[in-house]
Amino acid sequence: MSDIIREIEREYMRSDIPAFRPGDTVRVNVKVVEGNRERIQAFEGVVIKRQGSGINETFTVRRVSYGVGVERTFPVHSPRLASIEVIRRGVVRRAKLYYLRERTGKAARIRERRLARPEEA
């Protein structure tokens, strides 16, 4: 039975999702329907958690807008997501960054992960 469910879920899984982790800054482009029009709205912020697996996987992005913290949770494999871009990679030691909710300004900064340079030929 679970093989049938897994097979059906595999059809709906997206393959164009980049690898990202909590601490990374991402820009999520979401398809928004307004009346009979559809437009793309960008939401940029820090990934504070990623949970679930398979088709049920979600991630939460946090940003501060006009001094107010805004968190938005997206299903990873949703057809409403136009694209996900990784802006910066962050260095964190936790899988859930709930402690960022209490921090503001410089205290909420996350160090950038430096990637190994490709060797010059």
Swiss-Prot record:
Gene3D superfamilies, per database record: 2.30.30.790
Pfam families reported for this sequence: Ribosomal_L19
Chain segments annotated as transmembrane: none
One example of a Gene Ontology biological process annotation: translation
UniProt keyword Ribonucleoprotein, yes or no: yes
GO CC annotation terms, alphabetical: cytosolic large ribosomal subunit
Molecular function per GO: structural constituent of ribosome
Keywords: Ribonucleoprotein, Ribosomal protein
Keyword Transcription regulation found: no
PANTHER family for the chain: LARGE RIBOSOMAL SUBUNIT PROTEIN BL19M (PTHR15680:SF9), RIBOSOMAL PROTEIN L19 (PTHR15680)
Family membership noted in the UniProt record: Belongs to the bacterial ribosomal protein bL19 family.
Known function: This protein is located at the 30S-50S ribosomal subunit interface and may play a role in the structure and function of the aminoacyl-tRNA binding site.
Protein name in the entry: Large ribosomal subunit protein bL19
Organism, as annotated: Symbiobacterium thermophilum (strain DSM 24528 / JCM 14929 / IAM 14863 / T)
